Each structure stands twice: as structure tokens, then as C-alpha cells.
Amino acid sequence: MRFAVTALVGLLGLAMSAMPAGAADPATDDQKTMYALGLLISQSLGPFALTEPELEFVRSGMTDGVLKKAPKVDLQAFGPKVNQLQQARVAAQAETEKKAGAAFVAKAAAEPGAKKTESGAVITVIKEGKGATPKPTDTVKVHYHGTLMDGTVFDSSVKRGEPATFPLNQVIKCWTEGVQQIKVGGKSKLVCPSNIAYGDRGSPPAIKPGATLIFEVELLEIVKS
């Protein structure tokens, strides 16, 4: 992440101009919009995994920047440390997630009917299909439901009510491998360790660095070109 404090400060300035200090709940549409802006800014800060006391210092720095007060630290000296901090926090999050993920994958692999592939994916058939199986170069139409280890839904075509269509060789490795083992009309659960999902970078804000992902995938069709 490139040092982007200036952009964030500008956005915060808009929010601060619309909401009084110490405001509890946004009431007007403008206030709700600025509150939403604050939520978006918080997603940019997600990789830092800030504690409440740390967030107070971040808020103080952003407020001073917006109000053009004299900075309390030398930005040239401490600016580069922002990137160092992010890298350290992301690495720590990834290690924590991967450790929990390894235990989760091992448990999933021990369940009846589960099959662990050479890459580390765990595949469990939910419903057998009767059609063909796709090749990695095929385009497929699927319904899927993606969750984290704690059950949090991060993406779901099922919830959207609209199947997804994509080339099988342009998705995460776990999908490329796993969907090839589903026959048309079939449905399987894929447990995907981070190394064959989004890796140590994750896909913020929904997917943490090193996260293990769980998908229920129903293969509806192999799309003919």
C-alpha cells in the first residue's frame, strides 16, 4: 500500500464538515452519507488491525491534518514507517489465519466423504451430478456460497439470486481444481487453504490475509463458446 494519508485526510475532512463533534447517530441524509464515507475509510485502514487506543492517535493525526494544525511528528521520518507497520500487521494476521486454517482443513478432511487433494483443497460431494465435468479451459455457470471459517458470508451468488459465469482458468486455484471434479447438476463443498485461495495478501476488507475459505458450489452448466 502506497502512503496515502493525504487522500484519507481529505475524505475525513468532508465527513467532519457534515457531522458535529461527538455526534451519536447520523440523522440527515448528508450525515448518513458522511458516516458511510467513514466506514469506507475504515476499510482502507483494515490491514493495520488497529486497536482502540491506536485509532485515537490515527484520528488525532487526521484531525490535525484536516484542520491544518502543526503536525506533532516529522512526516518525512515517520511516513515510511506506515508501510513497515502495515507489512508487519498483515504478516501477523496471515500467520494467525493460516494456523487456524490448518486446523480447520484437517478437521474438514476427516469428515465422512471428504477428499483432500494434492494441493490441499478438501472436496466433499453434497449432490452428485449426472452431466459432464469441465476442463480448465471451459467457461462454467455456477451458483456458489462463500463463507469464512466462522460462517461469515463474504460472497454469494445464491444470495444475489443470479448465477455467475466465468472461465475456469481465471479464478483461484482451489476453484479451478475443485470445479473440474463436479459434474453438471452436482454440488460440492470446497475448503480452500489460503495458498490456493487469496494467499497472504487476502482480499480486504472481506477476506483477511492467510484466510481459509469455504465454498458450496453447484455446477449448472458448461457454457458452449
Describe each PLM feature range.
Residues R2-A4, P20-S225:
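Cross-family detector of peptidyl-prolyl cis-trans isomerase
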Residues T6-A18:
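Bacterial N-terminal signal peptides
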